[in-house]
């Protein structure tokens, strides 16, 4: 189990409270699909993913991105208990969707980039360290069913 200090929790929740989940969610998932194009195979039903502009303008990418970031919000509420909080999502992604768990790490890295671009100077090395710890712990929790 990952332990978050009070300072790390404060760093994460402070930025998260300012996050536009709808906007950043589409941006995060869109960036994942553009930077790591092999991840597109999990989104066959999303329609046109033929170019970066098509991906970023795709309403299904935006909607699912919002859903993904909403689950990050759940992670923030359950920072001390991530594996149980993500048990159902882990099962879904493992048993039904057959998503390579490495993709969870890639999404976490994209999340950190999105935070850095949105928050600039507020995204200090200390804040980044707290977020890296969180996205890594979320990736581990999502991959839990695979082990």
Swiss-Prot record:
Keywords: Heme, Iron, Metal-binding, Oxygen transport, Phosphoprotein, Transport. SUPFAM superfamilies: Globin-like. GO terms for cellular component: blood microparticle; haptoglobin-hemoglobin complex; hemoglobin complex. CDD domains: Hb-beta-like (cd08925). Residues 3-147 form the Globin domain. Red blood cells. The keyword Chloroplast does not apply. The modification Phosphoserine is found at residues 14, 51. GO terms for biological process: hydrogen peroxide catabolic process. Heme b binds at residues 64, 93. Belongs to the globin family. The epsilon chain is a beta-type chain of early mammalian embryonic hemoglobin. This is Hemoglobin subunit epsilon. It comes from Pan paniscus.
């Amino acid at each position: 189990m990952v332990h978050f200090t009070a300072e790390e929790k404060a760093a994460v929740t402070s930025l998260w409270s300012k996050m536009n989940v709808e906007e950043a969610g589409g941006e995060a998932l869109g960036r994942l699909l553009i930077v790591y194009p092999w991840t597109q195979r999990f989104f066959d039903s999303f329609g046109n993913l033929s170019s970066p502009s098509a991906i970023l303008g795709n309403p299904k990418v935006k909607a699912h991105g919002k859903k993904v970031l909403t689950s990050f919000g759940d992670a923030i509420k359950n920072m001390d208990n991530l594996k149980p909080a993500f048990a159902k999502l882990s099962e879904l992604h493992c048993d039904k969707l057959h998503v390579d768990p490495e993709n969870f790490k890639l999404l976490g890295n994209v999340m950190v980039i999105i935070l850095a671009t949105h928050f600039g100077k507020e995204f200090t090395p200390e804040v980044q360290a707290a977020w890296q710890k969180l996205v890594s712990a979320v990736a581990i929790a999502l991959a839990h069913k695979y082990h």
